[in-house]
């Protein structure tokens, strides 16, 4: 996928920033197909998947959604997240550009550990923590989400879940679980073409949509 993106950029068909914007637009466009939630909770990791998440957050906020972003690795852009952790967003990337745009347009960010503060209700959770590059165990990253989710479920919340490209906790290339409890998505919005993991997700009843973001020649 990265080779395809690099080829599209080298050919002048799109910039990385344009591709990220299109990806976020595709995810945001999928949301109206579901019952309208009261609240969108967007989870952003430190890479390009997280950059997509910041685009989604901005676009949903522009449609008058109440949007709360919870993130990991973005302390340089959002000092309120606390001391930097071991994994941080790389300066100069398109993801950082979109995180700053979210901040500059009035958006805020809270640490993942604050997720349990969200009151139970009608909630859309957008998973943009890890994307196609994930290959390592990620239980620690997902633990705050599952702690919050279990509380919402006990309180009778109506929770809908959407993952950007690949649910956090799965290897994109072989579908192997990288966490004891990978993120459970109702819908996955992927880009350009399905990845090997999507066959496993479909077999488990997950809806997978593939969006055209202009990578074809």
From Swiss-Prot:
Query: Source organism's superkingdom?
Result: Bacteria
**GO function terms (MF aspect):** metal ion binding; NAD(P)HX epimerase activity; nucleotide binding
For the ligand (K(+)), the binding residues are 49, 127, 168
Detail which positions bind (6S)-NADPHX. 48-52, 131-137, 165
What note does UniProt attach to the cofactor annotation?
Answer: Binds 1 potassium ion per subunit.
What EC number(s) are associated with this protein in UniProt?
5.1.99.6
Q: Which reaction does it catalyse?
A: (6R)-NADHX = (6S)-NADHX; (6R)-NADPHX = (6S)-NADPHX
Give the main EC class. isomerase
So what does this one do? Catalyzes the epimerization of the S- and R-forms of NAD(P)HX, a damaged form of NAD(P)H that is a result of enzymatic or heat-dependent hydration. This is a prerequisite for the S-specific NAD(P)H-hydrate dehydratase to allow the repair of both epimers of NAD(P)HX.
The record's annotation in NCBIfam families points to: yjeF_nterm (TIGR00197)
This chain's protein is named NAD(P)H-hydrate epimerase
Q: Which organism is it from?
A: Cereibacter sphaeroides (strain KD131 / KCTC 12085) (Rhodobacter sphaeroides)
């Amino acid at each position: 996928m990265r080779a395809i993106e690099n080829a599209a950029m080298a050919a002048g068909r799109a910039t990385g920033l344009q591709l990220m914007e299109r990806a976020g637009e595709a995810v945001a466009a999928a949301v109206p197909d579901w019952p309208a939630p009261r609240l969108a909770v967007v989870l952003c990791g430190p890479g390009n998947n997280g950059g997509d998440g910041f685009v989604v957050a901005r676009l949903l906020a522009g449609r008058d959604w109440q949007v709360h972003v919870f993130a990991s690795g973005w302390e340089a852009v959002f000092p309120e997240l606390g001391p930097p952790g071991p994994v941080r967003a790389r300066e100069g990337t398109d993801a950082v550009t979109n995180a700053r745009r979210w901040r500059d347009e009035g958006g805020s960010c809270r640490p993942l550990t604050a997720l349990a503060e969200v009151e139970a209700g009608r909630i859309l959770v957008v998973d943009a923590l890890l994307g196609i590059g994930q290959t390592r165990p990620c239980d620690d990253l997902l633990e705050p989400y599952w702690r919050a989710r279990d509380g919402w479920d006990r309180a009778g919340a109506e929770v809908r879940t959407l993952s950007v490209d690949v649910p956090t906790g799965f290897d994109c290339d072989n579908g192997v679980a990288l966490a004891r409890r990978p993120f459970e998505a109702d819908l996955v919005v992927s880009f350009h073409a399905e990845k090997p993991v999507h066959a496993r997700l479909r077999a488990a009843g997950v809806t997978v949509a593939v969006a055209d973001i202009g990578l074809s020649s």
